[in-house]
Amino acid sequence: MVAKILDGKQIAKEYRQRLKNQVNDLKEYGFTPKLSVILVGNDGASQSYVKSKKKAAEKIGMISEIIHLDESTSEEVVLSELNRLNNDDTVSGILVQVPLPKQVSEQKVLEAINPEKDVDGFHPINIGKLYIDEQTFVPCTPLGIMEILKHADINLEGKNAVVIGRSHIVGQPVSKLLLQANATVTILHSRTKNMNAHLKQADVIVSAVGQPGLVTKENVKKGAVIIDVGNTPDENGKLKGDVAYDEIKEIASAITPVPGGVGPLTITMVLNNTLLAEKLRRGLTK
């Protein structure tokens, strides 16, 4: 068995075309979604990622802006900028690129974003809505993972799904989404005993811990679906996933590559949530 490669770039391309069509439809009502991104400091990876989001938004017809603040910017100034964006009727979605400098509290900043413009889905209100099954902004990487599974026609009902990692960004929300899809979900973490036994039972594995080579051929059953969220740079700057890709693709039924798997869908879902925010505030959702 050779695994089906779940090509995130192609899935994202198709999804973004659908978003572009919806943006064009929205423009007929006189509304154009706008994404505002706050970047504090000069972290190279953050700058690159923010530029990718801006470019992707503009490519599908949205307006996008980057508010680039100096590394030494105070928390008060960041919160003031957020307040301005919260009250700007032209802004559909807001996100703050992390990590933030040490003088700025990430939690305070995330809680200061208007929940109706929180396209990252990290505001406590939106996290709470996710867990009581209300419509909300779902964190983008978990949403992207579910789109990959949907695109591949993978039926999750009754399947054993194992999630490695319990972060609020990926592990916990994707576990909730898998549960909503009627999978039986197990979360593994650094204190889990006998991790291999759990992995061996998994029909679907989502690994999101940033530990290259964690999941190997020895702890995956034949025919499992593997979603690799890891993206750790090696000494040459090449991205490595959590999964031993070359050996596991010989026994899995489907697998995401790194890079080019989950990553393209994460940015796509930022655009998805920005469009949703604009539709919701204009009363244009069905």
Curated annotation (Swiss-Prot):
Keyword tags: Amino-acid biosynthesis, Histidine biosynthesis, Hydrolase, Methionine biosynthesis, Multifunctional enzyme, NADP, One-carbon metabolism, Oxidoreductase, Purine biosynthesis
Domain of life the protein comes from: Bacteria
Of which family is this protein a member?
Answer: Belongs to the tetrahydrofolate dehydrogenase/cyclohydrolase family.
The name this protein carries in UniProt is Bifunctional protein FolD
Keyword NADP on this protein?
A: yes
Q: Which reaction does it catalyse?
A: (6R)-5,10-methylene-5,6,7,8-tetrahydrofolate + NADP(+) = (6R)-5,10-methenyltetrahydrofolate + NADPH; (6R)-5,10-methenyltetrahydrofolate + H2O = (6R)-10-formyltetrahydrofolate + H(+)
HAMAP family attached here? THF_DHG_CYH
Entries under Gene3D superfamilies matching the protein: Leucine Dehydrogenase, chain A, domain 1, NAD(P)-binding Rossmann-like Domain
Presence of keyword Glycoprotein: no
Which is a Gene Ontology cellular component entry for this protein? Answer: cytosol
Q: Origin organism of this chain?
A: Staphylococcus epidermidis (strain ATCC 35984 / DSM 28319 / BCRC 17069 / CCUG 31568 / BM 3577 / RP62A)
Q: Which SUPFAM superfamilies match?
A: Aminoacid dehydrogenase-like, N-terminal domain, NAD(P)-binding Rossmann-fold domains
Q: What's a BP term from Gene Ontology annotated to this protein?
A: L-histidine biosynthetic process
Q: State which pathway it belongs to.
A: One-carbon metabolism; tetrahydrofolate interconversion
Task: Report the Pfam families cross-referenced here.
Answer: THF_DHG_CYH, THF_DHG_CYH_C
Entry function: Catalyzes the oxidation of 5,10-methylenetetrahydrofolate to 5,10-methenyltetrahydrofolate and then the hydrolysis of 5,10-methenyltetrahydrofolate to 10-formyltetrahydrofolate.
Q: How does it assemble?
A: Homodimer.
Q: Where does NADP(+) bind?
A: G165, R166, S167, S190
- According to the UniProt entry, what is the EC number of this protein? 1.5.1.5, 3.5.4.9
**Signal peptide residue numbers:** none
* GO molecular function per UniProt: methenyltetrahydrofolate cyclohydrolase activity; methylenetetrahydrofolate dehydrogenase (NADP+) activity
